[in-house]
From Swiss-Prot:
Location, primary (coarse class): membrane
Gene name of this polypeptide: ccmA
Compartment(s) where it occurs, according to its Swiss-Prot or TrEMBL record: Cell inner membrane
Annotated NCBIfam families: ccmA (TIGR01189), PRK13538.1 (NF010061)
GO biological process, one term: cytochrome complex assembly
Enzyme class name: translocase
Protein name, entry field: Cytochrome c biogenesis ATP-binding export protein CcmA
Membrane topology: Peripheral membrane protein
Binding site for ATP: 36-43
């Protein structure tokens, strides 16, 4: 039994099948990239894995239990960062981290922002930051979260090369410690092929 299991998922949108018969199992320490053409359903699959959307058929299980039966404990073990940063634009970068990680002290939050490349921007309201900087505020949570499962939709959007390398290193560290990372990205990952498992969506199945 894996940590996260997908059984025979069917997803249809606007009378079109995005994927069907989709099944896979993820174990502790796995790093997975969901690939596929535009419109293949990559973001929708991530939403199904988070429980934000429901499949037309099939189910997702966490530690052997359907998500709807373990929703609270699952979400405690999940960090989801979608296309939108999901941050409070009227708060500063530091205030955002305090909001999402109330058990993190100021020193930890400052270190997380520094790791994300935001040293010197801690006290600036997020609505005054660039798109890339706003993305970094959300991604700074990777240095604070205790969640086992990270699901990240295009995390490198508007991030420069150095930032991508730093984030990639953090993801590698998380999987080496037994965590699971699932992401979509159009950018090449600068890591050994052996470390990445790729699930490619086609119209009917995953390869």
């Amino acid at each position: 039994m894996g940590m996260l299991e997908v059984r025979e998922l069917l997803c249809e949108r606007d009378e079109r099948t995005l994927f069907s018969g989709l099944s896979f199992t993820l174990n502790a320490g796995e790093w997975v990239q969901i690939t596929g053409s535009n419109g293949a359903g990559k973001t929708m699959l991530l939403r199904l894995l988070t429980g934000l959307s429901r499949p037309d058929a099939g189910e997702v299980l966490w530690q052997g239990q359907p998500l709807h039966q373990v929703r609270d404990s699952y979400h405690q073990n999940l960090l989801w960062i979608g296309h939108q940063p999901g941050i409070k634009t009227r708060l500063t970068a530091l205030e955002n981290l305090h909001f999402y990680h109330r058990d993190g002290d100021t020193a930890q939050c400052l270190e997380a922002l520094a790791q994300a490349g935001l040293a010197g921007f801690e006290d600036i309201p997020v609505n005054q930051l660039s798109a890339g900087q706003q993305r970094r505020v959300a991604l700074a949570r990777l240095w604070l979260t205790r969640a086992t499962l990270w699901i990240l939709d295009e995390p490198f959007t508007a991030i420069d090369v150095n930032g991508v390398d730093r984030l990639t290193q953090r993801m590698a560290q998380h999987t080496e410690q037994g965590g699971i990372v699932i992401l979509t990205t159009h950018q090449p990952l600068n890591v050994a092929e052996s470390k990445i498992r790729r699930i490619s969506l086609t119209q009917t199945r995953a390869v």
